[in-house]
Amino acid sequence: MWRSKNLRALCDRLDLQLVVKAPPGAFADAGAPLARLSKPVEAADEDALCACFNLGSDRDFRSDPCFGLIVLSEIASKALSPGVNDPGTAIHTIRAIQRVLHKWSVTLAEKADEDTDPEDQTQRVFLPGISVRHALECGFDPISFDGANRPVITRTLLSALSGLKAQDEALFSAQADELAQAMLA
């Protein structure tokens, strides 16, 4: 996770641009750069920039949005296990994932409206977004696998994907269709 306000302030002060290469929750490989700078900086400034990143061995909901989808998906998968056999909880969890993804799409739309200032030529920090495909896979793939032999789960998953498409066709349509086709294959 990064602290974008701190990054922006530092980049403003140093008059540079910074491109973050890894999305939140990504595995940070010691051999791969976390970010690229538009120009070299002093060691102290490099340390200050590095301090804006939160690296650790554990994922958390605040800094890694897809982690929340994964945890919800694991709850549904556990509910579908033979020892638990609780499809109602799995269905409830699928709907919770749908609500989370819908809220995300609304937030993205609001953010896009805020970011359309043609006068702002001072963007300093470029952060990677979370892909729709990745979000849908984190939320629905494990449930689809574990619930493949349960028509009620497949119907609920397809209904959730259809609902997401209806709520934001431009954002969800292509990936939701691909995931639905994979579920039915």
Protein language model features and the residues they cover:
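Short basic (Lys/Arg) and small-residue
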Residues: 1-16, 23, 32-185
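Residue-level "contact hotspot" at macromolecular interaction interfaces
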Residues: 21, 27-28
